[in-house]
A protein has these predicted regions:
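Conserved N-terminal structural module of periplasmic/extracytoplasmic solute-binding proteins
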Residues: 1-102, 119-121, 296, 313-317, ...
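Extracytoplasmic/periplasmic substrate-recognition and gating elements
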Residues: 58, 84, 242-243, 281-342, ...
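Short helix-initiation/N-cap motifs at beta->coil->alpha
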Residues: 69-79, 98, 174-180, 248-262
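Paired acidic/hydrophobic, glycine-rich loop segments that form the ligand-binding mouth/hinge
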Residues: 91-94, 266-271
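Hinge/lid segment of periplasmic solute-binding proteins
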Residues: 96-151, 290
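Short, solvent-exposed loop/beta-turn-alpha elements that line the ligand-binding surface or hinge
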Residues: 114-125, 169-174, 214-233, 280-284, ...
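Glycine-centered hinge/linker elements that transmit conformational signals in sensory
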Residues: 182-186, 220-250
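C-terminal capping/gating helix-and-loop segments adjacent to ligand/active sites or protein-protein/ligand interfaces
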Residues: 250, 363-416
């Protein structure tokens, strides 16, 4: 579900990272969690491939004792608290992509990876992903792990029965605009009563925003969530509701999963990691699915980084470990282990990722996700985006689920955004 407790917590604590980390003095002596030859790595369940972690421990055993620790619960809060407490700080820390903007303003608490030679690896990674790990002052805080290119998942037989294009290349070519996508949804509903093209309006709104180069706050700390790029995404979501191509179901609920299984929800816009969600959530649909390009251009949803904290006593060795763990073959293994889509284009052609997928009717989904990952637009991510984007996501959901008047919902969203902006010191 989109409005999980975790998601709400993130929205409410938008400025926490900046406040907590900002309390540390630059260059202070910070006790580390590692002692002697130990090197501590923090990450979360599914944040790294288990095979890659295991192999890294074995590979560097002669120089360090790599202690890779999976941190449960609210990872960001625990990392921030530990760093602010100046004790037991990990040498290497995973940083979730959705939280990255909160860490970048405090770049002085991390080792600048460029000073360790990061630039020589730059051309091996997606440009837009590489840029996301760099702070405004030029410090490279995060080394790329994965990304989440968004594509169009659909059920082959249902589309065929509805008289829609059903081969991946045809779906990509013929549903390449939002208008054509919506028209397909209307045809689907007409030919197969009770069916919907997508689960909810938030899928349309959020993906439309994520297709562009701007979000909710710009580099000058100015609120831009009332500008044309957001208004356009809002209008598309409202149109999807008005044209009745979205369901009244909530994503992730038993009713929604049943509708997917029954072919009543035969389509969704999802990131590469949604392949795993489908396989575990609706295993009986094996073989029914295919993947095509999403309308207009790809968006990104997800992806994380590895960092080296200032507490690290052996940053050069930590960097060697990071760069090895994140090379193309290991990123491919991370995809096999945990569905982490590689940020290294060289991975896309490796045999490991090129096996036909029976769940997707034998399709090689890398033919879609690989090119999509390379076409994503670089966007500025502000530490205030989460807080100032949430009212818009909440209100468009009210339009979709509760039938709230779109104009009233927009007005209410803007009022909430102004109050939050005032509190955070964001101009509008």
């Amino acid at each position: 579900m989109r409005l999980s407790r975790r998601g709400l917590l993130r929205a409410g604590l938008a400025g926490t990272a900046a406040t907590a980390l900002g309390g540390l003095a630059s260059g202070c002596a910070v006790p580390t969690g590692s002692t002697g030859r130990n090197m501590v790595l923090w990450y979360w369940d599914g944040g790294l491939g288990d095979t890659v972690v295991k192999n890294a421990k074995a590979r560097y055993d002669s120089t360090v004792d790599l202690q890779a620790i999976k941190i449960g619960g609210y990872y960001r809060s625990k990392l921030i608290t530990t760093m602010a407490g100046r004790a037991h700080i990990p040498d290497i820390a995973g940083l979730k992509g959705e939280d990255m903007a909160s860490y970048l303003p405090n770049s002085d608490q991390f080792v600048d990876l460029r000073t360790l030679g990061a630039d020589k690896y730059k051309n091996q990674y997606l440009t837009w992903k590489w840029e996301q790990g760099i702070a405004d002052d030029g410090t490279m805080v995060g080394f790329p792990i994965d990304c989440g290119p968004v594509a169009h998942f659909y059920q082959y037989a249902v589309f065929r029965r509805a008289g829609l294009p059903y081969e991946p290349a045809d779906v990509s070519g013929e549903l390449n605009t939002w208008e054509k996508f919506f028209a397909a949804g209307e045809q689907l509903r007409k030919r197969i009563p009770g069916s919907s093209l997508v689960t909810d309006v938030n899928s349309i709104f959020e993906n439309a925003v994520n297709q562009g180069s701007k979000r909710y706050v710009d580099k000058d700390r100015h609120f831009i969530g009332d500008q044309e790029h957001v208004r356009r995404a809002w209008a598309l979501a409202v149109e999807a509701k008005q044209r009745k191509i979205v369901s009244n179901l909530v994503s992730g609920t038993p009713d929604q999963l049943s509708a997917v299984e029954d072919g009543k929800l035969p389509s969704q816009l999802g990131a590469s990691w949604a392949t795993s969600d489908l396989k575990t959530g609706v295993p009986k649909t094996k073989g029914r699915w295919r993947v095509a390009d999403m309308p207009v251009r790809p968006a990104n949803n997800g992806g994380s980084f590895l960092s080296i904290t200032k507490a690290c006593r052996e940053p050069e060795e930590a960097f060697r470990i990071i760069t090895w763990m994140m090379n193309a073959p290991n990123q491919a293994q991370g995809f096999v282990d945990a569905g982490l889509f590689p940020s290294t284009p060289a991975s896309y052609g490796l045999k490991t990722l090129r096996a036909p997928d029976p769940f997707f009717g034998g399709q090689d989904t890398m033919d879609v996700f690989g090119p999509a990952a390379q076409k994503i637009t670089v966007a500025y991510n502000s530490p205030f985006d989460i807080a100032l984007g949430q009212p818009l996501k909440d209100e468009i959901k009210n339009v979709g689920v509760l039938g709230k008047d779109p104009k009233k919902a927009w007005s209410d969203a803007m009022s909430k955004c102004r109050r939050i902006a005032d509190h955070l010191g964001v101009s509008y």
